[in-house]
């Protein structure tokens, strides 16, 4: 009877003592990846050849996991494991897609054609900029108005001060004039009285 280490393909191959394939319901994936034969595009590519050298890759029933590791019989301490970077060109060659032709949908499935227009975000940005510009202009206008008002107020105050000064000066002159006028009237009256007295005396003397 074959021992578990030699036998391959059972559910305990990947999980050791536990049947992880059944436990995690991976049987369809296990069958897809492990039971099907290797595609020719992969088997002929340089990608796998660089990884395993001339070792024949067997996939499916009877495949041993240690066939991918060269000199598996030697212990890992004796071998210097070296990690090699992937060559992207070889990976592209290995996993090249076959269906590279453009896909054409029937007119019924295409739907309505979309017109090339500016995105909403662009139009929103433009609106925001326009609003900001408008707001800035309005603020500048308001600021200028306030400045003019302030200047006008200052001018008005200055004008009022000038008027008050003029009034004070003119009032002072008027008082002088009034005083001068009353003094002149008094003088005239005195002069008249003296004339009147002198004329009366003359009349009396003549009699």
From Swiss-Prot:
Extent of Basic residues compositional bias: 127-152, 168-179
Compositionally biased tracts (Basic and acidic residues): 153-167
One Gene Ontology term, aspect cellular component: mediator complex
Free-text function comment from the UniProt entry: Component of the Mediator complex, a coactivator involved in the regulated transcription of nearly all RNA polymerase II-dependent genes. Mediator functions as a bridge to convey information from gene-specific regulatory proteins to the basal RNA polymerase II transcription machinery. The Mediator complex, having a compact conformation in its free form, is recruited to promoters by direct interactions with regulatory proteins and serves for the assembly of a functional preinitiation complex with RNA polymerase II and the general transcription factors.
Protein family (similarity comment): Belongs to the plant Mediator complex subunit 19 family.
PANTHER family: LUNG CANCER METASTASIS-RELATED LCMR1 PROTEIN, MEDIATOR OF RNA POLYMERASE II TRANSCRIPTION SUBUNIT 19
Annotated protein name in UniProt: Probable mediator of RNA polymerase II transcription subunit 19b
Protein's organism: Arabidopsis thaliana (Mouse-ear cress)
